[in-house]
């Protein structure tokens, strides 16, 4: 066992004055009240477990990742989430656009393989995340804001978490801390994806001319020399605009690039621009996403790239599937089983690997031009592409998905000297 893992398993009582026989504060401690954490908390609470959620931020708070996929619609239904006009904009698919060549092509979810929903939503993340948090609270979760985690671990008796103001114990720990990825940092198990996007610069507009997008209100994925950009219509005539590239970016890349293009100029004419933000080094996977009494979920387990809007979908679906395995184990006292989540990880790895294969081709080949701007793909291939774009990536009858997975296996296979 590595030094990092040995430190990780050091009992709490060895480093604090807390009574080692103190009662547990919860069955499950969840770090983070974002989409993955709130989903896990809601579904566990619904089944009668005591769930404590520790969130560092106050809600509502702004986030990107505003375009959802049909693959999460069953989870929203399971949670009892009802779309609201102030939070949701109907999304029927995606439109890929190259302004330099004046080419574009629309992909509608209704053309995917049978099984997935035919639409999704764009959401105001501040309100959407708050709605998910409120649902967890309504089902019985104890959600505490302003809780910055300073230390965490597991021992023979359970899991423990220290914040800047308190200490907590539980039977199980779920890390849904997003890009903070507390477990991965603790165990030094965050492995970057080096062939994906490196940085993103983005902003929002109020009173934008979103009606110029036409009747569909699909996300626009703008193919650009430096990478790609997004244009997402949000409720209340708001607009989310950003650029992603493999190299370093700054505000000039946004202002002199995507925002200077004809579509953005029309959409933002007369609109009020809000703060510009920059994020970088966000693509990674946690190579030890679970163990006895702990698991990572959502972005804390893996984040690929924003290009195909997979993050929130994988977070909600992953959290729901995690609960389906964890809840029976908690009832039976099996939560310390090191092999508890083996089958779950195989399932999630199929989803991650599918999107990773798509993202890698997008950045490193002429895939985007051939598939997304190349005209007629043929019915079978188009349905397969649409199913992946819809986040329906847990199926075994999609030949396009099989192609992506086979290509990744070949690239990762060891070569002879």
What are these regions (language model features)?
Residues 37-38:
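N-terminal Rossmann-fold NAD(P) dinucleotide-binding loop
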Residues 28-30, 51, 294:
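Conserved hydrophobic helix-helix packing surfaces used for dimerization/oligomerization
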Residues 77-128:
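A conserved beta-strand/loop capping segment in the N-terminal third of enzymes
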Residues 20-34:
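Beta1/beta-strand and adjacent pyrophosphate-binding region of the FAD-binding site
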Residues 9, 88, 249-341:
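FAD/FMN-dependent oxidoreductases across multiple families
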Residues 135-265:
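Predominantly flavin-linked oxidoreductase catalytic cores and closely associated redox partners
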Residues 5-10, 327-417:
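C-terminal helical "tail/cap" subdomain of flavin- and related membrane-associated enzymes
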Residues 45-64:
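Glycine-rich FAD pyrophosphate-binding loop
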């Amino acid at each position: 066992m590595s030094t990092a893992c040995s430190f990780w398993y050091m009992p709490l009582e060895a480093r604090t004055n807390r009574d080692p026989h103190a009662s547990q504060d919860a069955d499950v401690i969840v770090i983070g009240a974002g989409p993955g954490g709130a989903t896990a908390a809601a579904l566990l609470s619904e089944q009668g477990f005591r769930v404590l959620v520790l969130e560092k931020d106050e809600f509502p708070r702004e986030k990107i990742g505003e375009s959802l996929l049909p693959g999460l619609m069953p989870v929203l239904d399971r949670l009892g989430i009802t779309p609201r006009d102030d939070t949701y904009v109907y999304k029927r698919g995606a439109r890929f656009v190259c302004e330099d060549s004046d080419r574009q092509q629309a992909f509608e979810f209704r053309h995917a393989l049978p099984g997935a929903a035919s639409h999704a939503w764009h959401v105001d993340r501040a309100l959407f995340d708050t709605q998910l948090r409120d649902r967890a609270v309504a089902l019985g979760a104890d959600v505490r804001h302003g809780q910055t985690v300073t230390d965490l671990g597991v021992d023979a008796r359970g899991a423990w978490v220290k914040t800047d103001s308190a200490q907590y114990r539980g039977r199980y720990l779920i890390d849904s801390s997003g890009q903070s990825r507390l477990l991965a940092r603790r165990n030094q198990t965050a492995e970057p994806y080096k062939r994906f996007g490196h940085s993103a610069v983005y902003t929002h507009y109020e009173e934008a001319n979103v009606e110029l997008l036409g009747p569909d209100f699909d996300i626009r994925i703008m193919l650009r020399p430096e990478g790609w950009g997004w244009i997402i219509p949000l409720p209340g005539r708001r607009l989310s605009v950003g650029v992603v590239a493999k190299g370093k970016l700054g505000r000039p890349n946004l202002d002199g690039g995507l925002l200077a293009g004809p579509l953005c100029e029309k959409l933002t004419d007369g609109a009020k621009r809000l703060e510009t933000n920059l994020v970088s080094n966000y693509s990674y996977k946690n190579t030890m996403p679970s163990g006895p009494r702990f698991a990572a979920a959502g972005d804390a387990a893996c984040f690929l790239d924003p290009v195909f809007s997979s993050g929130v979908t994988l977070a909600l679906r992953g959290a729901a599937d995690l609960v389906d395995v964890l809840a029976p184990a908690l009832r039976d006292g099996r939560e310390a089983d090191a092999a508890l989540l083996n089958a779950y990880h195989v399932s999630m790895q199929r989803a991650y690997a599918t999107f990773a294969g798509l993202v890698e081709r997008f950045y490193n080949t002429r895939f985007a031009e051939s598939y997304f701007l190349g005209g007629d793909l043929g019915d079978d291939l188009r349905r397969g592409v649409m199913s992946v774009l819809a986040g329906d990536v847990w199926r075994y009858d999609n030949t396009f998905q099989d192609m992506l997975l086979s290509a990744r296996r070949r690239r990762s296979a060891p070569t002879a000297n």
